[in-house]
Structure formats: C-alpha cells, structure tokens
C-alpha cells in the first residue's frame, strides 16, 4: 500500500521534478562556490526570473511548498529584466516556467470541477450564479493586480505613486463590497439547501459561503493563496498566448507558395 501524502507535498515533488531530477545533487555540490552565475545556470530559479516562483507565492500558507531548492537573487532578476528590455529572448526559461504553471493550473482546475460537482447545482442555477458573479471576478483580478503593482512601486522606492495607487485600491475594495452585496442578494435565492448556499472560487478552488460577511470574503480574495493563483493564471495565459503567436508566425513563414519580404 502506498503512503499518503499531502497535496502540497505532491505539488512540491512535481515542481522539483520539472526543475530537474538531479538539481538537489548539483546544488549541494556547488553551493559552497562563491561566484557569479550566468542566467542559464541550473541553480538559478527560472520561475523567479520570468514571473513568480510557486514556492514564494504560497510561502507561509497551508499550501506552502517549503523553500525553493534553487537560487532567488535580486541581481539575477534585474539582469534578466534588463536583457529582456534590450531585446534578448529566453524561450527555454519561459517553457520551464510554463510547464510548472501548467501543473498547478491543471490540478487546481481539476479540484474546482470536483468541488462544483459536489455542490450539484443544476445547469440553470450554475448559469445564473456565473452571470451575477462576473463583475465580482473582474474586480477581484483588478484588486490583485493593483496590490502587486503597489508592492513593486514600494520596492522601487516610488512611494508617492504607491500611495496614489493605494487610494485607488481602497476605492476598488469599496466598490467590490457594493457588488458583493448585490451578488449575495441574488445568489441567496438560488437553491434552498445548506449545501447550495456554498459556491466555489473558480480561481483557487476554495469553498465560499454566499452568507459570508464582506470582511470574510475580502480576507479570501486578498489572501495569499487566492492571489497566488491569480498571478499563476495570469502568467499562464500570457505565456500560452505568446506560444500561440510564435507558432502562428512560424507556420505563416513556412507556408508553400508564399513569398515574404
């Protein structure tokens, strides 16, 4: 009989496999060497360079993966961003990051599907809930993005701009409270059983009660796990779009009977 493991442990195992099966050995062997590493060095975390490492996104939460076995140094990220601005591309970094994101997004989507099935809403009820929560979803994404933008501004010592964006963030949060109140007024009439008073967050898969207070809902949507999945889904969609654009360009340039100048 196989031993049981937690979802976080399984995710950590998958991420480490994607980063390279022999990484831990190489990291321990060379960690004592103090030298500047090239960005392609396998000891440097490519997820950290391209976007956000899952180890960082869920640090300190119930889904914590522990500490990333690869290097996270600000100087490497700055170097990567500088070279990207200069026109250099790192498709292999993006592929590695996308592979890791795919694991998380697909697993989360599977959990969401199971959770939705457990609630057993009728098709009509599901459609009605989806319609009334669409505006709420848009606001959640904007709040998450603005929070990340404020963090970036603070790290860049853009304090004035950060304060200005903080005011806008509070306005968005206030607007979300108003929309959430409208949503609850509608969704409380959908289904009569206690089970049907629940809904599933279609970003992170958490169960939410439509009867929750604004504060409890805000705690969820501004929570580290939810915002972590917001970030991963944004980066996943962006990289998938880049892949489709790149593949389309390659196909167009190789079509027979066409001349390109």
UniProtKB/Swiss-Prot annotation:
One of its GO terms (cellular component) is U2-type prespliceosome. Present with 2270 molecules/cell in log phase SD medium. This is Protein LUC7. Its main location: nucleus. InterPro entries: Luc7-rel. Residues 123-190 form a coiled coil. It is found in: Nucleus. The gene is LUC7. Component of the U1 snRNP particle, which recognizes and binds the 5'-splice site of pre-mRNA. Together with other non-snRNP factors, U1 snRNP forms the spliceosomal commitment complex, that targets pre-mRNA to the splicing pathway. GO terms for biological process: mRNA 5'-splice site recognition; mRNA splice site recognition; mRNA splicing, via spliceosome.
């Amino acid at each position: 009989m196989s031993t049981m493991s937690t979802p976080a442990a399984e995710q950590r195992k998958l991420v480490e496999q994607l980063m390279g099966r022999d990484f831990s050995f190489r990291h321990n062997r060379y960690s004592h060497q103090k030298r500047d590493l090239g960005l392609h060095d396998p000891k440097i975390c490519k997820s950290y360079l391209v976007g956000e490492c899952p180890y960082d996104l869920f640090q300190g939460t119930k889904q914590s993966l522990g500490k990333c076995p690869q290097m996270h140094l600000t100087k490497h990220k700055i170097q990567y961003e500088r070279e990207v601005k200069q026109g250099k591309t790192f498709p292999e970094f993006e592929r590695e990051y996308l592979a890791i994101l795919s694991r998380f997004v697909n697993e989360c989507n599977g959990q969401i599907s199971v959770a939705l099935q457990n609630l057993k809403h009728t098709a009509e009820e599901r459609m009605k809930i989806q319609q009334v929560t669409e505006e709420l979803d848009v606001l959640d994404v904007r709040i998450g993005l603005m929070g990340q933008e404020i963090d970036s501004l603070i790290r860049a010592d853009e304090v004035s701009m950060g304060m200005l964006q903080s005011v806008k963030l509070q306005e968005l949060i206030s607007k979300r409270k108003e929309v959430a109140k409208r949503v609850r007024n509608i969704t409380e009439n959908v289904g009569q059983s206690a089970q049907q008073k629940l809904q599933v967050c279609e970003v992170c898969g958490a169960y939410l009660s439509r009867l929750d207070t604004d504060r409890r809902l805000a705690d969820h949507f501004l929570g580290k796990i939810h915002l972590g999945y917001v970030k991963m889904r944004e980066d996943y969609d962006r990289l998938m779009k880049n892949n489709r654009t790149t593949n389309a360009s390659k196909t167009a340039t190789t079509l027979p009977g066409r001349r390109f100048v």
